[in-house]
Amino acid sequence: MTTSVVTLSELLAARVHLGHRFNKWNPKMVSFIYAERNKVHIIDLVQTAFLLGEACDYVKLLAKKGKKFLFVGTRQELNTILAEEAERCNSFYINQRWLGGLLTNWVTIKSRVQALEKKESEGFFNSLPKKESARLKKELDKLRRYFNGIRKMNTLPDVVIIIDQRKDLTAVQECNKLNIPTICIVDTNCNPDIVDLPIPANDDAICSVKLILGKLVDFIKEGQIERELSKTS
């Protein structure tokens, strides 16, 4: 495993250790909980550092092989951070709303977007009654907004990185159905058993999410750079 991916001081400063109140916990997170303070569960940062290191090694290896990543985080306050980090490593992202069937029905959804865009470019909407034209334009605008981060994604991703398991549980379920590996931040109210690589951490604090996302993206970029260098050597 890569050493010194993150220090405990960095994790503490980013409030990664702060879980939820004890009465909101998921018992399956018990092995990742260090203690309870003032009725709030404290996450074991030693395990966080170790598992984040495992995840960083994994994404770097995949990036060296040219694999594609999809980042998912649809909470409004995460929209900008998620998009910026995904774009920093030339990866795909969903930061608005996860539409059911996005992965399990990917071919159909992708075809629908392409068909509407083609009709718009050909001026087809202008030949329709005003009400029908407005309806189709509204649908296309919605799909563009939701799928802005995956418009160039022509195939299913090789791995999906999820920020908020409870908010985007449907994404987790679709990945499991399609056997797409998942990396997921798991707070004390989450279920670590339904993802492939859990990273126990505070998924509510922006500083916590930003730190973990940043580390993963750094290692994806390292893998991508090594891949490019290997092509020229």
Curated annotation (Swiss-Prot):
Offer an example of a GO molecular function term for this protein: structural constituent of ribosome
Gene Ontology terms describing biological process: translation
Alphabetically sorted, this entry's keywords are: Chloroplast, Plastid, Ribonucleoprotein, Ribosomal protein
Localized where? Plastid, Chloroplast
Q: Has the keyword Transcription regulation been applied to this entry?
A: no
One Pfam family recorded for the sequence: Ribosomal_S2
GO annotations of cellular component type: chloroplast; mitochondrial small ribosomal subunit
> Record keywords: Ribonucleoprotein included?
yes
Q: Which SUPFAM superfamilies match?
A: Ribosomal protein S2
The family assignment reads: Belongs to the universal ribosomal protein uS2 family.
Please name the NCBIfam families in this protein's record. Answer: rpsB_bact
Name it. Answer: Small ribosomal subunit protein uS2c
Q: What organism does the record attribute this protein to?
A: Galdieria sulphuraria (Red alga)
